[in-house]
Amino acid sequence: MSSETKSEFGTKSAWLYNRTGKPKDVLYLEKGLHIPNPAELGPYDVLVEVVATSINPLDYKLMNTYQMIAKALFKLPNIPGYDFAGRVLAVGSEVKEFSATQRVWGCQSFPRAGRQGGSCATHIVTGDKDVWHLPDGVSFNEGAGFGIAGLTAWEVLVRQMKVKPGTKLVIEGASGGVGTFAVALAKALECEVTTISSTENLDLCKSLGATHTLDYKKDNLVERLADLGPYDFVFDCVNDNVLYRASSKFVKPDGAFFGIGGDITLSYVGSRLSRTLRPRVLGGSSHSYYNILLHVDQEMLRDFVDFVMKHNIKTVIDSVYDFEDTVEAFNRLMTHRCKGKVIIKTD
């Protein structure tokens, strides 16, 4: 590193991958990376010292997708991760909302993560519309967990479903990162919530506000949902085609499915297109199926955190790992047994 580019903030460390594969096979830690000086920031950039990050299934699915897809989506080597919480170090010349030392949380935009890298690092340069203030009393670990999981739940329930008091809702995969936020948000929005999870997670779902808790290991889900329904919406967090095909038995005629999850493969894309486009006479369902692609904006960040503070909604944290143990954090996430969020602390 030349003296002309030496940063006043020192250097950063980051986890990177330069080929596709499982995290344990492709992730490596690199130290001594350059941190931009204030003069090097774009006008709307915010430089954040990351205190905690959380990881999501999207992170390892992108890492483990086809090489040709990876090259089309992002620049290699790439830093994985989208969610973060930390302290502002410097801002661009046009940034008015933030200043140095402020506590913030955010979600790196997909295009920026592809070009410049994500949040599995000690420092991140993000856009001023992709970050918001972290309220007093909220820990960095909790704030890091808001990100994709909390905002996806908010997008589906508030912006897409537009739920209101009395809305009847099924949440499948209710004990994961998105699911736990969805249950808590739906409860605060006065919905009637039926959750689907494993036996060991029934109590967690109940504690978050579920009206009814179903066990996918023991219950006949279609029969139980038919008894408890009909429902306005189903929020599918696990990519379950079986429930969708049986939806006429428990979803109202004008109801709909909203889905996330699934691998980034051609077969997955085909199954999603089938659910979205295939008519009932060809084996599909009469209900609409909406695939959720999250687009974060500052209004969403602000509204979400205001709501969770008002209703005392907490991030459910499954586990916390040191930065050096990031590969182990991914291994935990990939068990599909997490109760809430997996957090990585960087300090």
UniProtKB/Swiss-Prot annotation:
The keyword Metal-binding does not apply. Disulfide bonds: none annotated. Its EC number is 1.-.-.-. It is found in: Golgi apparatus; Endoplasmic reticulum. Pfam families: ADH_N (PF08240), ADH_zinc_N_2 (PF13602). Signal peptide: none annotated. GO terms for cellular component: cytoplasm; endoplasmic reticulum; Golgi apparatus; mitochondrion. It is an enzyme of class 1 (oxidoreductase). One of its GO terms (molecular function) is oxidoreductase activity, acting on the CH-OH group of donors, NAD or NADP as acceptor. It comes from the Eukaryota. Gene3D superfamilies: Medium-chain alcohol dehydrogenases, catalytic domain (3.90.180.10), NAD(P)-binding Rossmann-like Domain (3.40.50.720). InterPro entries: ADH-like_N (IPR013154), GroES-like_sf (IPR011032), NAD(P)-bd_dom_sf (IPR036291), PKS_ER (IPR020843), YIM1/Zinc_Alcohol_DH_Fams (IPR050700). Keywords: Endoplasmic reticulum, Golgi apparatus, Oxidoreductase. Belongs to the zinc-containing alcohol dehydrogenase family. Quinone oxidoreductase subfamily. PANTHER family: ALCOHOL DEHYDROGENASE RELATED (PTHR11695), RETICULON-4-INTERACTING PROTEIN 1, MITOCHONDRIAL (PTHR11695:SF294). This is Zinc-type alcohol dehydrogenase-like protein C16A3.02c. It comes from Schizosaccharomyces pombe (strain 972 / ATCC 24843) (Fission yeast).
